[in-house]
Regions:
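Positively charged n-region of N-terminal signal peptides that target proteins for export
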Residues: 1-4
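C-terminal motif of bacterial Sec signal peptides marking the signal peptidase cleavage site
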Residues: 15-18
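Bacterial signal peptide processing site
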Residues: 20-22
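Immediate post-signal-peptide N-terminus of mature secreted/exported proteins
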Residues: 29-38
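Mature extracytoplasmic domains of secretory-pathway proteins
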Residues: 40-122
């Protein structure tokens, strides 16, 4: 009887052991190979869950765009889990080149998207102020930054 019971346990272990997947995709969601580490810069505008750091630098960028002066800036938004999502904006005196890099978001799809936009606008509501890109050649999330009132 003991031998039958041990054979039964061994059989069950083989069945469950054979069903295991070594890849375990739950642990690889959002992992992207060959993504360089993000190194923060004192020039970055940082949105940490609604708390904006270095907003003055962002306002200088908007002012330069309005005046037609070349400028570039990086806006970094952090996810709830603390992953940085980078949004690089480069103004060449005519258009704003937007590059959004979400590859470091462990729970997102992770991609790099590019767009060329004609302007940056300020949209005021009673609850918040949105800074958005306008006249973009690609369908993108055109919100650069949001400040809450």
């Amino acid at each position: 009887m003991k031998k039958v019971f041990l054979l039964y346990i061994l059989f069950i272990e083989l069945i469950f052991g054979g069903c295991q997947n070594e890849d375990n995709s739950a642990n690889t969601i959002g992992e992207h190979k060959n993504v360089p580490d993000y190194t923060p810069s004192s020039e970055d505008v940082v949105d940490m869950h609604g708390e904006i750091k270095n907003k003055e630098r962002f306002e200088v960028f908007l002012n330069n765009v309005e005046k037609g002066n070349n400028d570039s800036i990086r806006v970094v938004r952090y996810t709830e889990e603390g992953d940085p999502m980078l949004h690089d904006l480069e103004y060449d005196g005519e258009v704003i080149k937007s590059t959004t890099d979400t590859r470091r978001d462990k729970f997102g799809a992770g991609s790099i998207s590019n767009a060329t936009c004609t302007s940056a606008e300020i949209v005021e509501t009673t609850e918040r102020t949105e800074y958005v890109l306008e006249g973009c050649d690609n369908t993108i999330d055109n919100i650069i930054l949001v400040t809450w009132k």
